[in-house]
């Protein structure tokens, strides 16, 4: 019971966001550079392929459908700063350069998982 209370305390005081960043294939490393520069090391890069018809892609100003999808765990208090840096570095103000958004993490099962995501592996469990 005490361990469950500890997890609830940690989760309620240290909010995390899952940042999704979708960019053209090959641009994922530039996104990872931003996270690394901010000492955010819990990142996963996946490869994706869009399925929208080419006529829709042309209207949206999107070209190639091969994408890098980067998933990153960020302290909620740092999310806006990180999104701004990614947007600036990859020029998201231009159509077809990418998108980034956050999803708040409400809970994580397991204290070690939470500590891994928050890069706090210094305490004994």
Regions found by a protein language model. Give the residues of each.
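Positively charged, small/polar-rich N-terminal and surface patches that mediate targeting and assembly
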Residues: 1-125
